[in-house]
Amino acid sequence: GDVLSALPFDLYGDPAEPGLVCAPFLTAPASGPNVSVFDNGLPLDRTDWLRGGRLEHLTYHRAGAARSGATPTAPVDNLVLDLPGAGGTVDDLVARTERGLLLTCLWYIREVDPATLLLTGLTRDGVYVIEDGRIVGATNNFRFNESPVDVLARATEAGGTVRALGREFGEWVNRTAMPPLRVPDFNMSSVSQAS
């Protein structure tokens, strides 16, 4: 697969992941673009979506896999992003930042371009200014336009992976573990009045 990041990130789902255990078989209440109710019961093992920064798998329901000559690959009901060997916390990343913004929450995320995975959304509940390794104040919320593929490609540092709950899709994607990331040139397109 294509190399998506210079950093050797692993992105995977694993039904046996400690603290994020989920069903070891597919349970689809309705058919969608990546799963079919006809796939219910499909056994799920660890699936590496990225390994070492390189694309490993895409989702395929049984019918799509048959058409493509691929193996059916259903999404596991958890998601882990990890940079092997990385450690440290958000505070550690802040301490090593000369000047930047600390984003604590992204929400109202919508797809703009499915071909590039371009998303738009808003920051919320805390955008902090960092100078010389310290948080020196808060600033406005912003609208952003970014592709998660581009974010991983530009990431220059990651902390240790910790359990996280996404604000936007937390009721659907509630088993995740992610590291804090340093991402130069994150695209803030405009100031938002959201608070």
Positions of PLM-derived features:
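Dual-mode signal for accessory low-complexity, basic/Gly-rich regions
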Residues: 2-195
